[in-house]
Amino acid sequence: MPELPEVEVTRQGIAPHLEGNRVEALIVRNANLRWPVPELAQNIVGQTILGVRRRAKYLLIDTQAGTTIVHLGMSGSLRVLPKNTPVEKHDHIDLVMQNGRVLRFNDPRRFGAWLWSELPEAAHPLLEKLGPEPLSAAFHADYLQAALKGKKKAIKLCLMDNAIVVGVGNIYANEALFAAGIHPEAEAGKVDAERLTLLTAEVKTILTQAIKQGGTTLKDFTNADGKPGYFAQKLHVYGRGGETCTECGHLLSEIRLGQRTTVFCSLCQTK
């Protein structure tokens, strides 16, 4: 599943081809995504793209008339192509631009979304309850300590809770907790301020590195020009259960936590 760095890399890749350009057509070949593509999505036709933003794992394509909200789901991707590029399997939507380019949405598993909103961002049901961006100044140790106060849930589950902080999915939660030396099952409300300071710093560092390297390549992700990401080469724990720890040589443990695979070093990471 594309996580925050992959979505941000996609945003950076498509924005220069969309911003300031006018939409010629919206072609919907298959409207049956996670939610049906609404008829109102056609309201973008004739509009000039004012900006392409990211909020959590949502891409927001802004126009004066409203905003197209795109979610890549489990296997979705957006690519900017010449207008006459032949359509391939799972190419469900084309946003055709007057500059001769097309933004093409491909999604084999169809868990992604293509929606339209004329509401303020803070009022949209998908966006209104989201926590701060992890790379913003609003995400810091004092904030996280207050957000976790009294919580008995595992710290990893809280780190992946979009109401607490957005966009820290399974890959990067595993990696940040390893870098901070925190056991993923540690009771969130009992993690002290010093370790939360380290954790917030590691979240920012790891996400920034992943964005710079084009995201993490797993089964499905390629960025906007079709190239894979390379951060998978840097992973210390994710996907490495049963292998040796890169720091101490101990075998990495693998468990299920919140129905997600969780990998950690029981020596380097403490509760």
Curated annotation (Swiss-Prot):
Ranges annotated as FPG-type zinc finger: 236-270
Pfam (any one): Fapy_DNA_glyco
Cofactor(s) for this UniProt protein: Zn(2+)
Reaction equations catalysed: Hydrolysis of DNA containing ring-opened 7-methylguanine residues, releasing 2,6-diamino-4-hydroxy-5-(N-methyl)formamidopyrimidine; 2'-deoxyribonucleotide-(2'-deoxyribose 5'-phosphate)-2'-deoxyribonucleotide-DNA = a 3'-end 2'-deoxyribonucleotide-(2,3-dehydro-2,3-deoxyribose 5'-phosphate)-DNA + a 5'-end 5'-phospho-2'-deoxyribonucleoside-DNA + H(+)
PROSITE patterns: FPG_CAT (PS51068), ZF_FPG_1 (PS01242), ZF_FPG_2 (PS51066)
List of residues binding DNA: 90, 109, 151
Keywords: DNA damage, DNA repair, DNA-binding, Glycosidase, Hydrolase, Lyase, Metal-binding, Multifunctional enzyme, Zinc, Zinc-finger
Enzyme Commission number(s): 3.2.2.23, 4.2.99.18
InterPro entries associated with the record: DNA_glyclase/AP_lyase_DNA-bd, DNA_glyclase_Znf_dom_DNA_BS, Formamido-pyr_DNA_Glyclase, FPG_cat, MutM-like_N-ter, Ribosomal_uS13-like_H2TH, Znf_DNA_glyclase/AP_lyase, Znf_FPG/IleRS
Residues annotated as the enzyme's active site: 2-3, 57, 260
Molecular functions per Gene Ontology: 8-oxo-7,8-dihydroguanine DNA N-glycosylase activity; class I DNA-(apurinic or apyrimidinic site) endonuclease activity; damaged DNA binding; zinc ion binding
GO biological process, one term: base-excision repair
Cofactor binding note from Swiss-Prot or TrEMBL: Binds 1 zinc ion per subunit.
Subunit relationships: Monomer.
Function according to Swiss-Prot or TrEMBL: Involved in base excision repair of DNA damaged by oxidation or by mutagenic agents. Acts as a DNA glycosylase that recognizes and removes damaged bases. Has a preference for oxidized purines, such as 7,8-dihydro-8-oxoguanine (8-oxoG). Has AP (apurinic/apyrimidinic) lyase activity and introduces nicks in the DNA strand. Cleaves the DNA backbone by beta-delta elimination to generate a single-strand break at the site of the removed base with both 3'- and 5'-phosphates.
Family: Belongs to the FPG family.
Official protein name in the record: Formamidopyrimidine-DNA glycosylase
